[in-house]
Amino acid sequence: MADLEEQLSDEEKVRIAAKFIIHAPPGEFNEVFNDVRLLLNNDNLLREGAAHAFAQYNLDQFTPVKIEGYEDQVLITEHGDLGNGKFLDPKNRICFKFDHLRKEATDPRPYEAENAIESWRTSVETALRAYVKEHYPNGVCTVYGKKIDGQQTIIACIESHQFQAKNFWNGRWRSEWKFTITPSTTQVVGILKIQVHYYEDGNVQLVSHKDIQDSLTVSNEVQTAREFIKIVEAAENEYQTAISENYQTMSDTTFKALRRQLPVTRTKIDWNKILSYKIGKEMQNA
């Protein structure tokens, strides 16, 4: 092992450490970071070389953050990334600095985003917050209004998690929805993601995603927002139901087939008579 360490350059060590961090299960960033820190044994190298991994993890995971002085949490996503460690809170029209390692927001300041699309963004946000409150007790959502390739675009992000370290499991739901404001009809594109880690007496992860496409009728802001939420609700309910049904089927069939109900001899062992069996005698003589 010592020889291998000597063969690895600092760049290679950081690259390996960054991969561990980026792939940390939800709710387990600190544990993975601390383990990597011990393995690397060079705090300066880790902080400087793997800083991009800290940022990528938070962007990928839709990490929610509370800003002091404001009621609602906001999600850290690529759509709100203003560069230089600053992020947008479109609801409160502010930008703030975000520490990707400590996961803390500081220095909130007024920020004016795309005013031309703000009425559409607000309508979608109002409808989405009501939906999230009903379906995700711990959910957080952030809605952006941006001009992309010259088109006014709405991007809606949802995050909900449950971290149960005492019960050896953590899980996170993420979904991202996007559509452009065009006359009559537009295309809604979404991606739904589930990631769960269970690690009591084993190490099992569920990592699943589904891409969605649907048509949306565009009328006024409020009605369009309602129709959009109907698409979101139908798709997310269908996906969650399918996941549950698949796992029930696997439990009833696949996993049962993996278990041998009787040993190869087709006879159950009488543990009270174990010494009379050949294996018992071998154990006794060992």
UniProtKB/Swiss-Prot annotation:
Signal peptide (UniProt feature, chain positions): none
Any Gene Ontology CC annotation: cortical cytoskeleton
Keywords from the named record: Acetylation, Actin capping, Actin-binding, Phosphoprotein
Modified residues (Phosphoserine): S9
Pfam family, one: F-actin_cap_A
Post-translational modification N-acetylalanine, affected residues: A2
Gene3D superfamilies in UniProt: F-actin capping protein, alpha subunit (3.30.1140.60), F-actin capping protein, beta subunit (3.90.1150.210)
Matches recorded under PROSITE patterns: F_ACTIN_CAPPING_A_1 (PS00748), F_ACTIN_CAPPING_A_2 (PS00749)
The organism's place on the tree of life at top rank: Eukaryota
Subunit structure, interactors included: Component of the F-actin capping complex, composed of a heterodimer of an alpha and a beta subunit. Component of the WASH complex, composed of F-actin-capping protein subunit alpha (CAPZA1, CAPZA2 or CAPZA3), F-actin-capping protein subunit beta (CAPZB), WASHC1, WASHC2, WASHC3, WASHC4 and WASHC5. Interacts with RCSD1/CAPZIP.
Family: Belongs to the F-actin-capping protein alpha subunit family.
Protein name in the entry: F-actin-capping protein subunit alpha-2
Organism the protein comes from: Microcebus murinus
Gene assigned in the entry: CAPZA2
